[in-house]
Amino acid sequence: MKNLTDSFVYLGHWPSAGSFGFNTDILATNPINLSVVFGVLIFFGKGVLNDLLDNRKQRILNTIRNSEELREGAIQQLENARARLRKVETEADQFRVNGYSEIEREKLNLINSTYKTLKQLENYKNETILFEQQRTINQVRERVFQQALQGAIGTLNSCLSNELHLRTINANIGMFGTMKEITD
Protein backbone atom coordinates (compact mmCIF):
# COMPACT_ATOMS: atom_id res chain seq x y z
CA MET A 1 0.00 0.00 0.00
CA LYS A 2 2.88 2.34 0.83
CA ASN A 3 4.50 1.61 -2.56
CA LEU A 4 1.24 2.47 -4.29
CA THR A 5 0.99 5.73 -2.36
CA ASP A 6 4.65 6.52 -3.05
CA SER A 7 4.15 5.97 -6.78
CA PHE A 8 1.27 8.46 -6.77
CA VAL A 9 3.38 10.90 -4.80
CA TYR A 10 6.30 10.60 -7.24
CA LEU A 11 3.97 11.07 -10.22
CA GLY A 12 2.59 14.25 -8.71
CA HIS A 13 5.93 15.56 -7.36
CA TRP A 14 7.94 17.85 -9.59
CA PRO A 15 11.03 19.54 -8.18
CA SER A 16 10.39 23.23 -7.90
CA ALA A 17 12.85 26.03 -8.31
CA GLY A 18 10.83 28.28 -6.03
CA SER A 19 9.42 27.34 -2.68
CA PHE A 20 7.34 24.55 -1.20
CA GLY A 21 3.69 25.27 -0.41
CA PHE A 22 0.09 24.81 -1.37
CA ASN A 23 -1.15 26.32 -4.59
CA THR A 24 -4.49 27.91 -3.81
CA ASP A 25 -5.11 29.08 -7.38
CA ILE A 26 -7.27 26.26 -8.74
CA LEU A 27 -6.77 27.33 -12.37
CA ALA A 28 -2.97 27.15 -12.05
CA THR A 29 -2.95 23.80 -10.24
CA ASN A 30 -1.33 20.93 -12.06
CA PRO A 31 -3.95 18.47 -13.44
CA ILE A 32 -1.73 15.56 -12.42
CA ASN A 33 -1.76 16.73 -8.81
CA LEU A 34 -5.51 17.09 -8.93
CA SER A 35 -5.96 13.62 -10.43
CA VAL A 36 -3.71 12.12 -7.74
CA VAL A 37 -5.69 13.79 -4.98
CA PHE A 38 -9.01 12.72 -6.50
CA GLY A 39 -7.69 9.20 -7.03
CA VAL A 40 -6.62 8.92 -3.39
CA LEU A 41 -9.96 10.33 -2.22
CA ILE A 42 -11.91 7.89 -4.36
CA PHE A 43 -9.70 4.93 -3.42
CA PHE A 44 -9.87 5.47 0.34
CA GLY A 45 -13.36 6.94 0.65
CA LYS A 46 -15.27 4.56 -1.62
CA GLY A 47 -15.85 1.72 0.85
CA VAL A 48 -16.70 3.93 3.79
CA LEU A 49 -19.01 6.04 1.68
CA ASN A 50 -20.79 2.96 0.30
CA ASP A 51 -21.30 1.54 3.81
CA LEU A 52 -22.53 4.87 5.12
CA LEU A 53 -24.94 5.34 2.22
CA ASP A 54 -26.25 1.76 2.57
CA ASN A 55 -26.89 2.31 6.29
CA ARG A 56 -28.66 5.60 5.63
CA LYS A 57 -30.67 4.01 2.84
CA GLN A 58 -31.85 1.25 5.18
CA ARG A 59 -32.82 3.77 7.85
CA ILE A 60 -34.73 5.86 5.36
CA LEU A 61 -36.47 2.79 3.94
CA ASN A 62 -37.40 1.67 7.47
CA THR A 63 -38.75 5.13 8.21
CA ILE A 64 -40.75 5.08 4.99
CA ARG A 65 -42.09 1.59 5.83
CA ASN A 66 -43.09 2.78 9.30
CA SER A 67 -44.75 5.84 7.82
CA GLU A 68 -46.59 3.68 5.30
CA GLU A 69 -47.80 1.42 8.11
CA LEU A 70 -49.02 4.47 9.99
CA ARG A 71 -50.69 5.67 6.81
CA GLU A 72 -52.39 2.30 6.33
CA GLY A 73 -53.57 2.47 9.93
CA ALA A 74 -54.96 5.93 9.28
CA ILE A 75 -56.68 4.66 6.12
CA GLN A 76 -58.19 1.84 8.17
CA GLN A 77 -59.35 4.41 10.70
CA LEU A 78 -60.83 6.39 7.85
CA GLU A 79 -62.67 3.29 6.60
CA ASN A 80 -63.99 2.69 10.11
CA ALA A 81 -64.99 6.32 10.33
CA ARG A 82 -66.82 6.05 7.03
CA ALA A 83 -68.63 2.92 8.23
CA ARG A 84 -69.52 4.76 11.39
CA LEU A 85 -70.66 7.69 9.30
CA ARG A 86 -72.96 5.46 7.27
CA LYS A 87 -74.36 4.09 10.53
CA VAL A 88 -74.86 7.61 11.85
CA GLU A 89 -76.58 8.61 8.62
CA THR A 90 -79.09 5.75 8.90
CA GLU A 91 -79.75 6.70 12.50
CA ALA A 92 -80.16 10.29 11.37
CA ASP A 93 -82.94 9.24 9.04
CA GLN A 94 -84.68 7.58 11.99
CA PHE A 95 -84.19 10.49 14.35
CA ARG A 96 -84.48 13.34 11.87
CA VAL A 97 -87.41 14.87 13.71
CA ASN A 98 -85.65 14.92 17.10
CA GLY A 99 -82.12 16.09 16.39
CA TYR A 100 -80.91 16.43 12.84
CA SER A 101 -78.57 19.34 13.60
CA GLU A 102 -76.79 17.46 16.43
CA ILE A 103 -76.12 14.46 14.19
CA GLU A 104 -74.71 16.74 11.48
CA ARG A 105 -72.34 18.30 14.00
CA GLU A 106 -71.13 14.87 15.11
CA LYS A 107 -70.58 13.87 11.50
CA LEU A 108 -68.57 17.00 10.74
CA ASN A 109 -66.53 16.63 13.91
CA LEU A 110 -65.76 13.03 13.03
CA ILE A 111 -64.70 13.94 9.50
CA ASN A 112 -62.62 16.89 10.70
CA SER A 113 -60.83 14.88 13.38
CA THR A 114 -60.07 12.08 10.91
CA TYR A 115 -58.83 14.58 8.34
CA LYS A 116 -56.61 16.28 10.93
CA THR A 117 -55.19 12.92 12.02
CA LEU A 118 -54.39 11.98 8.43
CA LYS A 119 -52.84 15.38 7.79
CA GLN A 120 -50.67 15.11 10.91
CA LEU A 121 -49.49 11.64 9.95
CA GLU A 122 -48.64 12.79 6.42
CA ASN A 123 -46.74 15.81 7.78
CA TYR A 124 -44.86 13.60 10.24
CA LYS A 125 -43.89 11.20 7.45
CA ASN A 126 -42.65 14.04 5.23
CA GLU A 127 -40.71 15.69 8.06
CA THR A 128 -39.11 12.39 9.01
CA ILE A 129 -38.02 11.71 5.44
CA LEU A 130 -36.63 15.23 5.04
CA PHE A 131 -34.82 15.04 8.38
CA GLU A 132 -33.24 11.68 7.53
CA GLN A 133 -32.15 12.97 4.12
CA GLN A 134 -30.52 16.07 5.62
CA ARG A 135 -28.83 14.04 8.33
CA THR A 136 -27.53 11.56 5.78
CA ILE A 137 -26.20 14.31 3.53
CA ASN A 138 -24.46 16.02 6.45
CA GLN A 139 -22.89 12.78 7.65
CA VAL A 140 -21.69 11.90 4.15
CA ARG A 141 -20.14 15.35 3.78
CA GLU A 142 -18.42 15.03 7.15
CA ARG A 143 -17.15 11.53 6.37
CA VAL A 144 -15.79 12.55 2.93
CA PHE A 145 -14.05 15.57 4.46
CA GLN A 146 -12.47 13.40 7.16
CA GLN A 147 -11.30 10.85 4.62
CA ALA A 148 -9.83 13.56 2.39
CA LEU A 149 -8.05 15.16 5.33
CA GLN A 150 -6.66 11.84 6.53
CA GLY A 151 -5.51 10.97 3.03
CA ALA A 152 -3.79 14.33 2.59
CA ILE A 153 -2.07 14.07 5.98
CA GLY A 154 -0.94 10.55 5.20
CA THR A 155 0.41 11.64 1.82
CA LEU A 156 2.25 14.59 3.34
CA ASN A 157 3.71 12.48 6.14
CA SER A 158 4.92 9.84 3.71
CA CYS A 159 6.55 12.49 1.47
CA LEU A 160 8.47 14.41 4.13
CA SER A 161 11.79 12.98 5.35
CA ASN A 162 14.12 14.07 8.14
CA GLU A 163 16.51 15.64 5.62
CA LEU A 164 13.70 17.71 4.11
CA HIS A 165 12.61 18.80 7.59
CA LEU A 166 16.17 19.91 8.45
CA ARG A 167 16.56 21.81 5.16
CA THR A 168 13.24 23.56 5.71
CA ILE A 169 14.15 24.49 9.29
CA ASN A 170 17.59 25.78 8.23
CA ALA A 171 16.07 27.84 5.41
CA ASN A 172 13.53 29.39 7.80
CA ILE A 173 16.25 30.15 10.37
CA GLY A 174 18.27 31.84 7.62
CA MET A 175 15.27 33.92 6.57
CA PHE A 176 14.62 34.99 10.17
CA GLY A 177 18.30 35.91 10.58
CA THR A 178 18.18 38.05 7.44
CA MET A 179 14.97 39.69 8.64
CA LYS A 180 16.58 40.44 12.01
CA GLU A 181 19.62 42.03 10.33
CA ILE A 182 17.33 44.19 8.19
CA THR A 183 15.28 45.37 11.18
CA ASP A 184 18.40 46.08 13.28
Curated annotation (Swiss-Prot):
Belongs to the ATPase B chain family. The gene is atpF. F(1)F(0) ATP synthase produces ATP from ADP in the presence of a proton or sodium gradient. F-type ATPases consist of two structural domains, F(1) containing the extramembraneous catalytic core and F(0) containing the membrane proton channel, linked together by a central stalk and a peripheral stalk. During catalysis, ATP synthesis in the catalytic domain of F(1) is coupled via a rotary mechanism of the central stalk subunits to proton translocation. Component of the F(0) channel, it forms part of the peripheral stalk, linking F(1) to F(0). It is found in: Plastid, Chloroplast thylakoid membrane. Coiled coil: none annotated. The chain crosses the membrane at residues 27-49. It comes from Nasturtium officinale (Watercress). Pfam families: ATP-synt_B. The lineage of its organism: Eukaryota, Viridiplantae, Streptophyta, Embryophyta, Tracheophyta. This is ATP synthase subunit b, chloroplastic. It is a single-pass membrane protein. F-type ATPases have 2 components, F(1) - the catalytic core - and F(0) - the membrane proton channel. F(1) has five subunits: alpha(3), beta(3), gamma(1), delta(1), epsilon(1). F(0) has four main subunits: a(1), b(1), b'(1) and c(10-14). The alpha and beta chains form an alternating ring which encloses part of the gamma chain. F(1) is attached to F(0) by a central stalk formed by the gamma and epsilon chains, while a peripheral stalk is formed by the delta, b and b' chains. Keywords: ATP synthesis, CF(0), Chloroplast, Hydrogen ion transport, Ion transport, Membrane, Plastid, Thylakoid, Transmembrane, Transmembrane helix, Transport.
